[in-house]
C-alpha cells in the first residue's frame, strides 16, 4: 500500500491500524544535535489522545511513545528516528456486526474496492488513530521550527453553526474544545450534549496559524507553499476543504479590499493572503482553515450494502467522537509543522 510517506527532505513514514498491535513512524532527514526525548513528543500526543473528556470518544489510549532509534544521549544523531506507540484499548467485538457491511460515509467501500480486503475493526488503516504518529512526528518538527523562532498554534473556530470568536490564545489548551474563547464553552457543551443525545455527529472548522516565518519559503509553480499546505491538510481524515487567508470570503471582495498593501514603515497593512503570495511566504503569519465533516460513525441507522451487494442497514456501534474536528487541532498543527520544516530545510539547501 503506497502513499504512507510525507515530505521531501524531512520525511515521515507511518504504519499501523486502529485495532492493530501498534502504531509506528520513521522520521528521516532530521538534522543532528537537536535535543529530543520522549517527554517532548508526549506533550503533543497528550493533547490529541482520546478519552480525555466526555465530549470526545471514550476509547482510552495512553498513547505512550517510545523512541527506538535516531537519538543518543538526548540528541538526534541525524539517522532515522523510529517511534512506536502500543494500542491498548481496542474493542474489536464492537465491529463484528459490520464485518461484511460497508458503513455509509466511511472508507470501507473504497478500501474494499481497491484492495479486495479490508480491516473492518475501527476502519483499520483509514482510521484517525493513524494520526497519532503524525502528531508525534510533528512534535519533532515543532522543536526544529522553534529553534528558528517559528511557532504554530491551532484552535477550533466553529462547531456546527456555532462560530467562536478568537479572544484568548492562552485559553486554547485549557478547555476540551481547543477554543480561544472562555465565554463560548457553555454553548459548545450544550451543542455536543445535544448532538450526542440524538445519536448524531457534527462538523467543525479548525484554524491553524504559523508565526515568526521568514519570507521566501515555497517553490513555484507546482510546489507552492500554499499548495503543499493544502495537500498536507487534505490528507487528514475527515477534512473536506482547506482555505488560506480569507479563503472563500475573497469571492465577495473587491481587489481594492483584498490586496495586501505595503509601506516602508509599517510593512504589510493587512494579511488577506494568509502569509503567502505567489506560492512563497511573505514573512507574515500563515493562516489556514480546515473544514472537518461530521463523522459517519453514528447511532442512527443508515442504508448501505454488504460485500455481496445486497441492501442492508448499518448502525455503527463502538466509541466515537461526536465532533472529530475538536481533536483535529493538534493534528492540523502537526501537518503544518511538517510542511514548514521540510520547506525550511529545502530553502536552506538552495542557499547553501
Curated annotation (Swiss-Prot):
Cite a single GO BP annotation: amino acid biosynthetic process
Chemical reaction(s) catalysed: 5-O-(1-carboxyvinyl)-3-phosphoshikimate = chorismate + phosphate
Q: What is its EC number?
A: 4.2.3.5
**So which cofactors does this thing need?**
FMNH2
Q: Which cellular component appears as one GO term in the record? A: cytosol
Q: Which GO terms describe its molecular function?
A: chorismate synthase activity; FMN binding
Pathway(s) of this molecule: Metabolic intermediate biosynthesis; chorismate biosynthesis; chorismate from D-erythrose 4-phosphate and phosphoenolpyruvate: step 7/7
Query: Under which name does UniProt file this protein?
Result: Chorismate synthase
Q: Which SUPFAM superfamilies match?
A: Chorismate synthase, AroC
Does the record's keyword annotation contain Amino-acid biosynthesis?
Answer: yes
Q: Name one Pfam family in it.
A: Chorismate_synt
Q: Which organism is it from?
A: Francisella tularensis subsp. tularensis (strain SCHU S4 / Schu 4)
**Keyword NADP attached:** yes
How does this protein assemble? Homotetramer.
Gene designation: aroC
The family annotation for this protein states: Belongs to the chorismate synthase family.
Q: How is the cofactor bound?
A: Reduced FMN (FMNH(2)).
Amino acid at each position: 500500500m503506497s502513499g504512507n510517506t510525507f515530505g521531501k527532505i524531512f520525511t515521515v513514514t507511518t504504519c499501523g491500524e486502529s485495532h492493530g498491535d501498534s502504531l509506528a513512524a520513521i522520521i528521516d532527514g532530521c538534522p543532528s544535535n537537536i535535543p529530543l526525548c520522549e517527554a517532548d513528543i508526549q506533550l503533543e500526543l497528550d493533547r490529541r489522545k482520546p478519552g480525555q473528556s466526555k465530549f470526545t470518544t471514550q476509547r482510552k489510549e495512553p498513547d505512550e511513545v517510545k523512541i527506538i532509534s535516531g537519538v543518543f544521549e538526548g540528541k538526534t544523531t541525524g539517522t532515522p528516528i523510529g517511534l512506536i506507540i502500543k494500542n491498548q484499548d481496542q474493542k474489536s467485538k464492537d465491529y463484528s456486526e459490520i464485518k461484511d457491511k460497508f458503513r455509509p460515509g466511511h472508507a470501507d467501500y473504497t478500501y474494499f474496492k481497491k484492495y479486495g480486503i479490508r480491516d473492518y475493526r475501527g476502519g483499520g488503516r483509514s482510521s484517525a488513530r493513524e494520526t497519532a504518529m503524525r502528531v508525534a512526528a510533528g512534535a519533532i518538527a515543532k522543536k526544529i521550527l522553534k529553534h528558528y523562532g517559528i511557532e504554530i498554534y491551532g484552535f477550533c473556530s466553529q462547531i456546527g453553526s456555532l462560530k467562536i470568536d478568537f479572544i484568548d490564545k492562552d485559553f486554547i489548551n485549557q478547555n476540551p474544545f481547543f477554543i480561544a474563547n472562555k465565554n463560548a464553552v457553555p454553548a459548545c457543551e450544550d451543542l455536543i450534549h445535544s448532538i450526542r443525545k440524538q445519536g448524531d455527529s457534527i462538523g467543525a472548522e479548525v484554524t491553524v496559524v504559523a508565526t515568526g516565518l521568514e519570507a521566501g519559503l515555497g517553490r513555484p509553480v507546482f510546489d507552492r507553499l500554499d499548495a503543499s499546505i493544502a495537500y498536507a491538510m487534505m490528507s487528514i481524515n475527515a477534512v473536506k476543504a482547506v482555505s488560506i487567508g480569507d479563503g472563500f470570503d475573497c469571492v465577495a471582495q473587491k481587489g481594492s479590499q483584498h490586496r495586501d498593501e505595503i509601506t516602508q514603515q509599517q510593512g504589510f497593512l493587512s494579511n488577506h493572503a494568509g502569509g503567502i503570495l505567489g506560492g512563497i511566504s511573505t514573512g507574515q503569519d500563515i493562516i489556514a482553515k480546515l473544514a472537518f465533516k461530521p463523522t459517519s460513525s453514528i447511532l442512527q441507522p443508515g442504508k448501505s450494502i454488504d460485500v455481496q451487494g445486497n441492501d442492508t442497514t448499518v448502525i455503527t456501534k463502538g466509541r466515537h467522537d461526536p465532533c472529530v474536528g475538536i481533536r483535529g487541532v493538534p493534528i492540523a498543527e502537526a501537518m503544518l509543522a511538517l510542511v514548514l520544516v521540510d520547506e525550511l530545510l529545502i530553502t536552506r539547501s538552495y542557499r547553501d
